[in-house]
């Protein structure tokens, strides 16, 4: 065999080996895909309800005066009385949080009834917000009454929540998984196959939905508070959990 023929055979052999080396992984991947077991994927849902055990109040004190200093002083005095009353009612310091202080000029704008040529500042308003967590729902009406009497004249929101809903959410999780298993069994029976082990599970939890009281309704309650104790209907909070579960098919 001459040198040219030997070189040709060697090159051909190398090419065959190279093609084979690249073909093996592709063959292995294709074989793995064709042997992957059949599966059933379902979504299970679980819900639990719980009566609220805590109220979150968002209140505000608003004062107006000729000067910003006078408005600030009046606002501080009113807020101090409100905070003192909260503490006397058994609200702990950890459940009281003052928010931002808002100072705004009060303008009078030119119209047919005045001789103003441009907007004029006639005074200032100062408002301070306060978030209160009330852990005894029976005291919410009394606390609102006292707050309005002492100076709260603006209301934001009232939410009835659960302080620690972990146990309720865990029960909702159990119900969601049980619901997923029931769905998978129904599908497997309808398809005439057996249900195998769980190979994948993930949670799609939704945030709890506290029992809110609309802002307009809350302001109406505040306005009525000096004459009558504010009635509070606690209702129930709903906790929903969804799970995605994948089963093997036997």
Swiss-Prot record:
Q: What is its main location?
A: periplasm
Source domain of life is Bacteria
A single GO BP annotation from the record? DNA damage response
What are the record's GO terms for cellular component?
Answer: periplasmic space
Q: Where does the protein end up?
A: Periplasm
Signal peptide per UniProt: 1-28
Which keywords appear in this protein's UniProt record, sorted alphabetically?
Periplasm, Signal
Give the matching InterPro entries. Answer: 26kDa_periplasmic_antigen, SIMPL/DUF541
Protein known as = 26 kDa periplasmic immunogenic protein
In the UniProt record, the gene name given for this protein reads bp26
């Amino acid at each position: 065999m001459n040198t040219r023929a030997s070189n040709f055979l060697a090159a051909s052999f190398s090419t065959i080996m190279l093609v084979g080396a690249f073909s093996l992984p592709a063959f292995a991947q294709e074989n793995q895909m064709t042997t992957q077991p059949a599966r059933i994927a379902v979504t299970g849902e679980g819900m639990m309800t719980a009566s609220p055990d805590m109220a979150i109040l968002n209140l505000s004190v608003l004062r107006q005066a000729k000067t910003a200093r006078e408005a600030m002083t009046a606002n501080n005095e009113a807020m101090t009385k409100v905070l003192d009353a909260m503490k006397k009612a058994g609200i702990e310091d950890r459940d009281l949080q003052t928010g931002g202080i808002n100072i705004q000029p009060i303008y009078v704008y030119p119209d047919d009834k005045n001789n103003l040529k441009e907007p004029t500042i006639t005074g200032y308003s100062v408002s301070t917000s306060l978030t209160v967590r009330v852990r005894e729902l029976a005291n919410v009406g009394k606390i609102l009454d006292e707050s309005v009497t002492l100076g709260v004249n603006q209301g934001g929101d009232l939410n009835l929540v659960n302080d620690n809903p972990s146990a309720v959410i865990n029960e909702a999780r159990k119900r969601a998984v049980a619901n997923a298993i029931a769905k998978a069994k129904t599908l497997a029976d309808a398809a005439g196959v057996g249900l195998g082990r769980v190979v994948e599970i993930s949670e799609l939890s939704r945030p709890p939905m506290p029992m809110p009281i609309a802002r307009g309704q809350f302001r109406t309650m505040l306005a009525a508070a000096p004459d009558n104790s504010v009635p509070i209907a606690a209702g129930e909070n709903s906790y929903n959990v969804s799970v995605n579960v994948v089963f093997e098919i036997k």
